[in-house]
Amino acid sequence: HKTIDNVIKRTFKHYYDHTDADIIFDRGPWGIPANLELLKKYYDPDPKFLILNRPLVEVLASFLKVKKSGTDKDLTDSLMDPNTGKLKQDMVSSRNIVKSNLPHLKIEYNDLVSDIKKTIEDIYKFFNIPFFKHRYTDLEQLSYNNVKYDDSVMECNLHTIRTDKVKKEELNLEDYFSKDTIDKMKGYDIYV
């Protein structure tokens, strides 16, 4: 038992040792009860969370837009699988954070893409981070420790960004779903 505790503590402490950064936002379903328990026990008893909120129907459509192969049903079933689905885990995590009244900032996707400067400033304020002047045009593809993402091994091209500027790309939802399905998903609130 103590051995496992030591391993977990050191994992949290040293996971980002090789990363040259003062501040790191770790993306993951940390609000899932088991993950939250580990986070509070081994890293920070009072964690703060950032939640990016976007309508479910838009999230699913954006995945379908960039999928490389397979059926739409296979991809949505995979994303929404109650036990292993990435999107389902993120939804459960976000819901648990909000319902648990843990300190969190929920930002809307539309606010992020329509007024990124203000949204970033709101994030800095919430996390008490000193302001940093960002560039929102002429962007570069993400690399991490001089390694760029290779989405050729993924089901979807998830990491390539538009480099000219941050903007919302409009999706015609009816290209991906029936009107009935769109109406059902538009009324779905993950926080209820």
Positions of the model-derived regions?
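PAPS-dependent sulfotransferases, especially Golgi type II membrane carbohydrate sulfotransferases
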Residues: L64-K67, K99, K125-V192
